[in-house]
């Protein structure tokens, strides 16, 4: 049993290493392995925009395998999916030097859910539609978006859609204090 267990650990590491470099965060200074998920992120935003602008679709379900989820997790900065390996031929990914594990990033039936809430009508102060708010669930657990994103209030997991479009863009800009809801705009 001991030798078989060691073999299983070695094979698990080999599969994780392959996925890490091909679909995960990979090595420092590159993003090709996960920017391939950008069209999926763009579709999340497009679906929200379509609904907010009068579309009748109330939910969008997308189904995919780990080969899609791993890059999407790295792109979103989900827990355990962001630590890159050094850009080196000698300092490579190992379990000892990196938290990334395929079984954690994409367990069986891994899922990402965005809930969107928006008040109908227009903000009387701006004359524009109220800003949609978004929260994310990762494997059924409500979590914050990546650290570059500013929630509507300290400790909240709700974000303005405009903030997410900025902070999840490739340059990770944030609206800063404008991402917060003010006391007189809590219904926005």
Model-found features: residue ranges?
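Non-catalytic terminal regions with compositionally biased, polar/charged low complexity
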Residues: 1-188
């Amino acid at each position: 049993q001991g030798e078989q267990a060691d073999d299983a650990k070695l094979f698990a590491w080999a599969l994780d290493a392959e996925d890490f470099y091909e679909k995960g965060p990979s090595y420092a200074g590159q993003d090709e392995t996960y920017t391939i998920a950008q069209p999926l992120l763009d579709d999340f935003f497009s679906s929200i925009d379509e609904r907010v602008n009068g579309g009748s679709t109330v939910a969008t379900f997308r189904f995919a395998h780990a080969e899609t989820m791993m890059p999407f997790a790295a792109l979103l900065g989900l827990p355990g999916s962001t630590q890159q390996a050094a850009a080196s031929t000698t300092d490579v990914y190992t379990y000892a030097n990196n938290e990334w594990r395929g079984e954690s990033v994409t367990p069986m039936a891994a899922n990402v859910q965005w809930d969107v809430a928006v008040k109908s009508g227009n903000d009387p102060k701006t004359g524009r539609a109220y800003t949609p708010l978004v929260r994310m669930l990762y494997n059924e657990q409500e979590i914050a978006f990546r650290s570059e994103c500013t929630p509507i209030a300290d400790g909240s997991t709700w974000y303005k859609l405009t903030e997410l479009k900025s902070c999840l863009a490739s340059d990770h800009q944030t609206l800063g204090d404008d991402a917060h809801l003010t006391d007189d705009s809590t219904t926005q």
